[in-house]
């Protein structure tokens, strides 16, 4: 996520470790709520909500550099609010997608489905970090990388709502 570098670029002196602590709070909070919604059959909504939170978080990260020029004191607060928002988003998405994959697989393939999801997540994070770093170095810095990431999340949300979510509802086994 390059958040430590970006925090320094924004002039945040209070330490970006707070960012990850607040992100953890968001993760824990969202897992409590998301789990109950999934138990009530709201899996597609949980994925959609989580993706929306991530979308807002990435758009806000991209905007922080511009906001800094108008109100630098506001940037620190927003930076930490974004941590909570991203924590909620990731906390909703990660376990919900795993449940989605497992619920599409027959009983004897559930572990394979979960492993496939985890591997896909890892590959996506790795590729995203490399592409984001190259984009930031070559073009417009980290704000551009976060903006491109936000558009990728927007595309994934549309894809999920139009194709993957309905496919899951039609084909789920549990």
Briefly describe each language-model feature range.
Residues 1-15:
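Short amphipathic helix-loop junctions that connect adjacent transmembrane helices
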Residues 134-152:
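A membrane-interface helix-boundary motif in multi-pass transporters
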Residues 92-105:
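Intracellular juxtamembrane helix-capping segments at the cytosolic ends
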Residues 13-14, 107-117:
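Loop-to-transmembrane helix entry/capping segments in MFS-fold secondary transporters
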Residues 30-43, 136-137:
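Helix-to-loop junctions at the C-terminal end of transmembrane segments
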Residues 149-174:
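Multi-pass alpha-helical transporter architecture, strongest
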Residues 45-60:
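Structural signature of the two symmetry-related core transmembrane helices
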Residues 18-27, 121:
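Transmembrane alpha-helical segments of major facilitator superfamily
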């Amino acid at each position: 996520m390059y958040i430590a570098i970006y925090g320094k670029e924004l002039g945040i002196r209070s330490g970006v470790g707070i960012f990850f602590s607040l992100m953890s709070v968001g993760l824990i909070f969202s897992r409590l709520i998301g789990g109950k919604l999934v138990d009530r059959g709201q899996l597609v909504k949980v994925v959609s909500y989580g993706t929306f939170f991530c979308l807002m978080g990435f758009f806000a990260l991209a905007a922080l550099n511009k906001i800094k020029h108008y109100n630098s004191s506001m940037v620190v607060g927003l930076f930490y609010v974004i941590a909570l928002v991203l924590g909620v988003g990731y906390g909703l998405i990660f376990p919900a997608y795993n449940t989605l994959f497992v619920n599409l697989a027959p009983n004897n393939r559930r572990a394979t489905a979960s492993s496939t999801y985890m591997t896909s997540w890892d590959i996506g994070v790795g590729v995203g970090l490399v592409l984001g770093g190259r984009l930031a170095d070559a073009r417009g810095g980290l704000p551009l990388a976060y903006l491109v990431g936000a558009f990728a999340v927007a595309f994934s949300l549309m894809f999920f709502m139009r194709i993957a979510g309905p496919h899951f509802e039609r084909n789920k086994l549990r």
